[in-house]
């Protein structure tokens, strides 16, 4: 468990009260773990799904970080261009198939995804759609419900 909040004591002439924040810290950890996992689940329908390996690798990388507040929206090496939704080409040849050692550049041509529901910047699209639901569910978990 992470220590988000430290416990503290209140001392008066007649009394001393120790306040433990363990339950609050536990609830915060639980809420963060839920949110990280839920974001990944909600993103999947909008992600490119040609063979499924891109999503599998992205899920595995996100799962390894679950509870940290870090989400992997698109695992490399293809994640960047898939997420941006633009064709990338070898600057010298103009071909999507790059020469060995060539650094691809982004074009203004949109990618065509095999998944009809896939969208560029799928995390942003997902956040816009689910943010209110996420906030409500996180709040419940923080409250211990």
Report each predicted region and the residues it spans.
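Short, Lys/Arg-rich flexible segments
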Residues: 1-79, 91-145
């Amino acid at each position: 468990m992470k220590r988000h909040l430290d416990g503290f004591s209140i001392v008066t002439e007649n009394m001393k009260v120790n306040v433990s924040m363990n339950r609050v810290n536990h609830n915060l950890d639980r809420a963060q773990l839920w949110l990280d996992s839920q974001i990944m689940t909600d993103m999947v329908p909008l992600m490119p799904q040609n063979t499924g390996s891109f999503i599998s690798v992205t899920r595995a990388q996100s799962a390894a970080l679950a509870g940290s507040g870090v989400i992997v929206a698109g695992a490399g090496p293809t994640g960047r261009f898939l997420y941006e939704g633009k064709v990338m080409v070898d600057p010298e040849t103009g071909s999507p198939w790059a020469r060995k050692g060539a650094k691809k550049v982004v074009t203004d041509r949109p990618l065509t995804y095999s998944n009809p529901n896939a969208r560029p910047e799928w995390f942003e699209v997902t956040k816009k759609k689910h943010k209110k639901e996420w906030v409500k569910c996180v709040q419940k978990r923080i409250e211990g419900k």
